[in-house]
């Protein structure tokens, strides 16, 4: 008995010591090669996704003499979450995403978040339009297509919520043209697959916004990266993994990279480093050792969709129809039936279904989550898990789903669907931010966030949705934070040529909304609606023809969707 007790005690002590060693093991102290460049490059971009490439595109136009180097671990650009198959492709404008417009306790609808996101997407349209005009992006139909956005609900409470949401939004110029209906015949005209086979006694409602879009962020990222390489001041390094980050006494950074083809390491000195590595950004932030990194952790969640490629189905669904999450469900559970343009053909995707994984990237390691845990964030992560038990239960339930379970969910939005119509596809990984709040301690943070060191020499983008849709706006914020002096000394003037609405709120003025949307609609071959001087409830607004190019009730209180 005593021997058993001693043995058990020994195991407990050994486990405790191993845990302490694991949590306190240094993240960033190891021997690395010295930098092989005495004169530092101006910017190092880590990660070949849309964020790094968008920032590089801005910088190349604002400061063409700067030397920029981009390092990507995989053998191509936009292979992770920026790839068309790895995200929902929604041009997030808050037209359809109900979780951006929560119902408050007094019954009113909060629309500030929706307006902000809608304005951010208009900035994206301006940025992409500028790139098209300068030949840095291909014909617009290769990366953005008019795809109406719908919200679709059933049940009296949710119908009333959607009615109030519609009434609140259409008073704003950016949402002019959104239609609302409870008439099954009208909704069937908008989206036949949603209504066919549905019982006649089920009360439904929908909103329909003709200005919605479907976006292929992979095409945008790859084409912008291609044109970045036209400059002799830009260098792209594929199959190169960043393994260490060290700040020098002069505030420059030594970025150590491993060539995955031969295993050799080298270091590059840089004045500024941007970590835009998607899910891997957290671990790289921790490698930097900056004090700000101690306030963050991450929780990975994968996504899966049901994919339809049969033209008999895809030709009859040309909208993105967003539903409402079940009560108590987390944001990644918001269901949507999406029309997509991928690999040159029409696709319909339904989902997402959460996929539990400890990977931070689709092509990552199963040890990603564990290697990000340390003595700064371990207790906080456990606390977040305890305080978000609904999320834990949801993920456990999703892990046990069968194909029959997924099909049952599908039938709520596509009543006539057959199991033989679809295949299950795995999308990209997302890493939800766990952040230290001064008052609440560690909390689950939704959205994206820029983390920057006090010297403004290293910046990291953490988080997820709306993400790629608002990448030009997010990178504008980063430019202002990281390069305040350059902004004052001429960049702001140049930015107004790239983003004509820069420094203004588009939603504040029908005239500005019309000016910007008319310009971007013409350049991007998208439909256009003229907003009256005094925006009011529209009555069958007329859509201008597309320009032809020559070539509570809120069942999801967290403000985010996958």
Curated annotation (Swiss-Prot):
<feature type="region of interest" description="Disordered">
    <location>
        <begin position="530"/>
        <end position="562"/>
    </location>
</feature>
<dbReference type="GO" id="GO:0008924">
    <property type="term" value="F:L-malate dehydrogenase (quinone) activity"/>
</dbReference>
<keyword id="KW-0560">Oxidoreductase</keyword>
<comment type="pathway">
    <text>Carbohydrate metabolism; tricarboxylic acid cycle; oxaloacetate from (S)-malate (quinone route): step 1/1.</text>
</comment>
<dbReference type="InterPro" id="IPR036188">
    <property type="entry name" value="FAD/NAD-bd_sf"/>
</dbReference>
<keyword id="KW-0285">Flavoprotein</keyword>
<dbReference type="GO" id="GO:0047545">
    <property type="term" value="F:2-hydroxyglutarate dehydrogenase activity"/>
</dbReference>
<dbReference type="Pfam" id="PF06039">
    <property type="entry name" value="Mqo"/>
</dbReference>
<feature type="compositionally biased region" description="Polar residues">
    <location>
        <begin position="551"/>
        <end position="562"/>
    </location>
</feature>
<keyword id="KW-0274">FAD</keyword>
<keyword id="KW-0816">Tricarboxylic acid cycle</keyword>
<dbReference type="GO" id="GO:0006099">
    <property type="term" value="P:tricarboxylic acid cycle"/>
</dbReference>
<dbReference type="InterPro" id="IPR006231">
    <property type="entry name" value="MQO"/>
</dbReference>
<protein>
    <recommendedName>
        <fullName>Probable malate:quinone oxidoreductase</fullName>
        <ecNumber>1.1.5.4</ecNumber>
    </recommendedName>
</protein>
<comment type="similarity">
    <text>Belongs to the MQO family.</text>
</comment>
């Amino acid at each position: 008995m005593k021997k058993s007790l001693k043995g058990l005690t020994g195991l407990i002590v050994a486990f405790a010591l191993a845990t302490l060693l694991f949590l306190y093991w240094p993240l960033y102290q190891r021997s690395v090669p010295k930098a092989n460049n005495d004169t530092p490059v101006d910017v190092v971009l880590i990660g070949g996704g849309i964020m790094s490439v968008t920032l590089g595109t801005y910088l190349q136009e604002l400061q063409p003499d700067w030397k920029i180097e981009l390092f990507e671990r995989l053998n191509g650009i936009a292979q992770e979450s920026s790839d068309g198959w790895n995200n929902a492709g929604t041009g997030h404008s808050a037209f359809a995403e109900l979780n951006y417009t929560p119902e408050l306790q007094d019954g009113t609808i909060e629309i500030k978040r929706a307006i902000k996101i809608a304005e951010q997407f208009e900035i994206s349209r301006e940025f992409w339009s500028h790139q098209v005009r300068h030949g840095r992006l291909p014909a617009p139909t290769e990366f953005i297509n008019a795809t109406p956005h719908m919200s679709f609900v059933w049940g009296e409470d949710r119908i009333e919520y959607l009615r109030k949401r519609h009434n609140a939004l259409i008073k704003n110029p950016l949402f002019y043209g959104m239609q609302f209906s409870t008439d099954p015949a009208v909704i069937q005209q908008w989206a036949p697959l949603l209504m066919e086979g549905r019982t006649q006694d089920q009360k439904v409602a929908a909103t329909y916004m003709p200005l919605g879009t479907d976006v292929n962020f992979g095409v945008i990222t790859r084409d912008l990266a291609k044109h970045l390489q036209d400059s002799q001041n830009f260098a792209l390094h594929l199959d190169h993994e960043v393994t260490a980050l060290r700040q020098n006494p002069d505030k420059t950074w030594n970025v150590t990279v491993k060539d995955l083809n031969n295993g050799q390491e080298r270091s590059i000195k840089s004045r500024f480093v941007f970590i835009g590595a998607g899910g891997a950004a957290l671990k790289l932030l921790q490698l930097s050792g900056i004090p700000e990194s101690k306030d963050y952790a991450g929780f990975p969640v994968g996504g899966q969709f049901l994919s339809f490629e049969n033209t008999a189905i895809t030709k009859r669904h040309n909208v993105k129809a967003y539903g409402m999450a079940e009560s108590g469900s987390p944001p990644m559970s918001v269901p949507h039936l999406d029309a997509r343009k991928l690999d040159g053909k029409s696709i319909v995707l339904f989902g997402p279904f959460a996929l539990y994984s400890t990977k931070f990237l689709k092509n990552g390691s199963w040890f990603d989550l564990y290697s990000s845990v340390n003595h700064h964030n371990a207790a906080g992560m456990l606390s977040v898990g305890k305080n978000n038990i609904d999320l834990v239960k949801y993920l456990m339930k999703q892990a046990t789903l069968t194909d029959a379970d997924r099909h049952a969910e599908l039938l709520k939005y596509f009543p006539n669907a057959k199991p033989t119509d679809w295949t299950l596809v795995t999308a990209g990984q997302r890493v939800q931010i766990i952040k230290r709040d001064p008052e609440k301690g560690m909390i689950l943070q939704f959205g994206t966030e820029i983390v920057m060191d006090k010297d403004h020499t290293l910046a990291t983008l953490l988080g997820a949705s709306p993400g790629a849709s608002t990448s030009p706006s997010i990178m504008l914020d980063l430019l202002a934070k990281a390069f305040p002096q350059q902004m004052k000394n001429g960049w702001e003037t140049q930015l107004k040529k790239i983003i004509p609405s820069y420094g203004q709120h588009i939603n504040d003025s029908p005239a500005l909304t019309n000016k910007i949307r008319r310009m971007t609609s013409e350049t991007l071959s998208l439909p256009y609606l003229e907003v009256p001087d005094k925006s009011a409830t529209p009555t069958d607004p007329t859509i201008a023809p597309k320009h032809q190019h020559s070539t509570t009730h809120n069942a999801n209180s967290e403000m985010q969707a996958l």
